[in-house]
């Protein structure tokens, strides 16, 4: 059978030691992360360790919570001729944000914005977003996406903090902002009879 260990109570050094021990014994190791490991994960230092010790590894892509949010909201996050950019970011909490990536600067584009790890600083998030998004911009607070107790709360940007606080939403909440939420307008040119492409000319 498999040996299963939770990394929640382990330091990075303890994780490395355990993985190397099993690797040196010729055993197969799976380091399982939530979501997709390339987004707000901790795989960079793990890859550096594997590289340093010549350990072969393979990364299997996962499904990020922002993708689960789009599915739960039954929304396409890019809308033809209206929104063509999705921003994945977070508010500034204990880990400082680079100056050029402050939330209010990113908000200038009024793109679809998916905000991770920021329910605890929702007042600050709302304040920064409202510097550029209209107060009535659609928002969604998506709690425990893909879990059995998943909950979705829709509203307007001006009520975002109220929505999060009144429903006691925690760190595992994805905040989505933008006109793409619930949008049913705009047609893709992909299937237009006037549009020629590789498979139809």
Q: Model features per residue range: what roles?
A:
Residues 14, 24-29, 48, 83-85, ...:
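A contiguous loop/helix-start segment that scaffolds small-molecule binding in enzyme catalytic cores
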Residues 36-109, 151-154:
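Class I SAM-dependent methyltransferase SAM-binding "motif I" and its flanking Rossmann-like core
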